[in-house]
């Protein structure tokens, strides 16, 4: 049987798309602001 393609890692996910990672770049901050404007319950993944 073939190996499953998605083998998620919590650490990798947070490093890529966590709150601190989003705050680092201007684009990431705009993502957070747009999610706040939309009224999302969760602003980021973690």
Swiss-Prot record:
- Supply the name of the protein: Large ribosomal subunit protein bL34c
**Biological processes, Gene Ontology terms:** translation
Family classification:
Belongs to the bacterial ribosomal protein bL34 family.
Q: Where in the cell is it found?
A: Plastid, Chloroplast
Signal sequence bounds: none
Q: Sorted alphabetically, which InterPro entries does this protein's record hold?
A: Ribosomal_bL34 (IPR000271), Ribosomal_bL34_CS (IPR020939)
- What does the entry list under GO cellular component? chloroplast; ribonucleoprotein complex; ribosome
**Chief subcellular location:** plastid
Alphabetized, the UniProt keywords read: Chloroplast, Plastid, Ribonucleoprotein, Ribosomal protein
Question: Which GO molecular-function terms appear in the entry?
Answer: structural constituent of ribosome
| PROSITE patterns associated with the record | RIBOSOMAL_L34
Q: Does the keyword Metal-binding apply?
A: no
